[in-house]
């Protein structure tokens, strides 16, 4: 999230005082904050590139990851769709090097689709070059990491790229720009497709640019006709787009000459930034969940906004990775789900900024400061959720505080067990107070806020580390129990999965694996009332 914030002396009031100091709101070239972020970003990219390179070697080695898959979390009942899908042979070649996409790139007209629907792709490549599109589903697949679903126009054929127009000029007020490209390809998703992270890999197959690749991320939702999965993963596409600098505009000052107040899904993702988000923080979780046979499905932030009633149909909802940007409707959906009760799981720095959609959810609007927002509507004005009386800690038990961030190149810090040895999740892993789980806390983290959460908050792990201001801050992992009985597992870190899967070249930590499996078993037990709530008409929303 990359901004300056002041130490909390309360809740929302302290944030209001210092919103004008936020790097991503009003940082000026040459300011100390902007300079700090300019120093930070190249090192972030270097680490992300290293991680992306390690993907290539990690996918061929299943011995280390076998630790994370031993003793599956899933019950020994009939195989669920994810188990059946991951039993199929994987396909190498889905990996995209960090920083690719400068020669061939593209985006989809849809953020997500249901099985049986299609993605409409807008691909740009040097005119006259021939290219092919490979569509993969990403998952475990015995450590292969992906499976080839189809090729466009065919796995042995290709098509000629035509010229696409330049991006639109940035809007003089908001900085909004789009890529007004024609649809070049249609990727039909089979009716029996399994929900998940999908990827359209773009490759030039002949000519001087042969071998150049790019990628378009795709999300396939669960079929409306299917029984709701036990676990729903919310994919943080809003945050991907907030940091996306393609065309020279993101919501941030640190990676663009001047930040925008609105960004569009009608443009490619900067491939480096996509690796920073999805490859580093999300795919290790996807691999861990699927190798353990978890009954899981996936939907985007935009899907939650379109169908807020979708959350309580599942036993556990996981806001994966770095899920920083929510609409008010999304926040309300999570609040209602916890009251249902549906259990919740978070990484860190989740649901912090309130944004809104425009253009049928193809545009994200984020003015940052409600006093500047031309909407002048307390239900949709932009800013911290805490500025509107809804701090994250009321939902999660923890919250991201000012300067609780540092350079990603710094080695992640260990968590220290803070809960009692009798705690069922800790006991399942043989963890006792004072034990350490190395290398899982860094980049951005969350802290407990006493008296904020309405229920009980049980500390599980903690650590203290210096933030970007040089001051020592706490990072806290907690289990919060709401008055409804719903549980919240707030990890306090985005990097926990770095010790659950070997995607980043590190062997899984056996005790952390056992701990997370115990947590998932508890969080996915059948809830009361019945999790299979009636589907609302909004469920049948079109591709988003």
Please tell me what each predicted stretch does.
Residues 82-103:
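Proline/serine/threonine-rich low-complexity linkers at boundaries of modular beta-sandwich domains
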Residues 105-126, 135-138, 148-150, 157-206, ...:
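Ligand-binding face of N-terminal immunoglobulin V-set domains in extracellular IgSF glycoproteins
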Residues 190, 194, 378-483:
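Catalytic beta-strand/loop cores that center a nucleophilic Ser/Cys/Thr
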Residues 55-72:
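C-terminal region of N-terminal signal peptides and the immediate post-cleavage residues
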Residues 128, 134-138, 150-153, 210-313, ...:
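Aromatic-Pro/Gly-enriched surface loop or interdomain linker
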Residues 324-422:
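A glycine-rich, often tryptophan-bearing local segment used as a flexible ligand/cofactor-contacting loop or short
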Residues 289-291, 304, 325, 432-533, ...:
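Extracellular low-complexity, Gly/Ser/Thr-rich intrinsically disordered linkers
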Residues 160-177, 186-194, 274-358, 500, ...:
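Helical hinge/lid and interdomain linker segments adjacent to catalytic or ligand-binding clefts
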């Amino acid at each position: 999230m990359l901004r300056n914030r002041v130490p909390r002396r309360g809740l929302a009031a302290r944030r209001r005082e210092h919103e004008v100091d936020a790097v991503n709101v009003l940082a000026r070239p040459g300011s100390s904050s902007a300079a700090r972020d300019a120093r930070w970003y190249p090192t972030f990219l270097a680490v992300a590139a290293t991680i992306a390179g390690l993907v290539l070697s990690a996918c061929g080695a299943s011995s280390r990851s076998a630790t994370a898959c031993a003793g599956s979390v899933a019950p020994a009942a009939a195989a669920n769709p994810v188990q059946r899908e991951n039993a199929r042979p994987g396909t190498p070649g889905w990996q995209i090097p960090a920083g690719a996409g400068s020669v061939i790139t593209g985006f989809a007209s849809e953020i997500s689709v249901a099985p049986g629907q299609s993605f409409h792709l807008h691909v740009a490549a040097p005119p006259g070059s021939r290219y092919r599109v490979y569509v993969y589903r990403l998952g475990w697949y015995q450590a292969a990491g992906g499976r080839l679903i189809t090729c466009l126009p065919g796995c042995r054929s290709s098509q000629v790229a035509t010229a696409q127009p330049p991006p639109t000029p940035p809007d003089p007020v908001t900085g909004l720009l789009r890529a007004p490209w024609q649809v070049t390809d249609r990727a039909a998703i089979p009716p029996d497709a399994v929900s998940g992270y999908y990827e359209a890999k773009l490759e030039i197959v002949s000519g001087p640019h042969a071998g150049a690749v790019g990628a378009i991320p795709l999300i396939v939702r669960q079929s409306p006709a299917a029984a709701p999965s036990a676990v729903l993963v919310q994919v943080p596409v809003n945050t991907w787009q907030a940091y996306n600098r393609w065309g020279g505009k993101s919501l941030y000052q640190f990676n663009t000459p001047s930040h925008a107040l609105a960004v569009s899904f009608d443009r490619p993702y900067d491939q480096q930034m996509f690796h920073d988000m999805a490859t580093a923080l999300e795919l290790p979780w996807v691999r861990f969940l699927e190798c353990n046979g978890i009954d899981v499905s996936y939907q985007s932030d935009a899907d939650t906004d379109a169908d807020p009633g979708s959350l309580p149909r599942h036993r556990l909802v996981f806001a994966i990775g770095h899920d920083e940007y929510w609409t008010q409707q999304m926040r309300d959906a999570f609040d209602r789900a916890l009251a249902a009760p549906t259990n919740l799981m978070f990484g860190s720095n989740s649901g912090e900024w309130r944004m809104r959609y425009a253009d049928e959810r193809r545009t994200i609007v984020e003015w940052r400061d409600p006093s500047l927002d031309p909407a002048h509507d307390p239900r949709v004005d932009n800013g911290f959720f805490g500025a509107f009386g809804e701090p994250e800690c009321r939902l999660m038990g923890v919250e991201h505080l000012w300067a609780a961030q540092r350079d990603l190149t710094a080695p992640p810090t260990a968590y220290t067990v803070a809960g009692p040895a009798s705690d069922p999740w800790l006991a399942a892993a043989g963890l006792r107070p004072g034990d350490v789980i190395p290398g899982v806390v860094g980049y951005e983290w969350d802290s407990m806020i006493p008296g904020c959460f309405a229920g009980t908050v049980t500390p599980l792990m903690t650590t203290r580390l210096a933030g970007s201001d040089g001051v020592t801050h706490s990072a806290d992992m907690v289990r919060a129990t709401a008055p409804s009985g719903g549980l919240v597992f707030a990890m306090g870190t985005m990097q926990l999965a770095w010790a659950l899967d070997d995607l980043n070249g590190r062997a899984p930590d056996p005790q952390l694996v056992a701990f997370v499996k115990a947590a998932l078993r508890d969080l996915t037990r059948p809830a009361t009332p019945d999790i299979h709530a009636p589907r609302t008409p909004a469920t049948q929303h079109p591709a988003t």
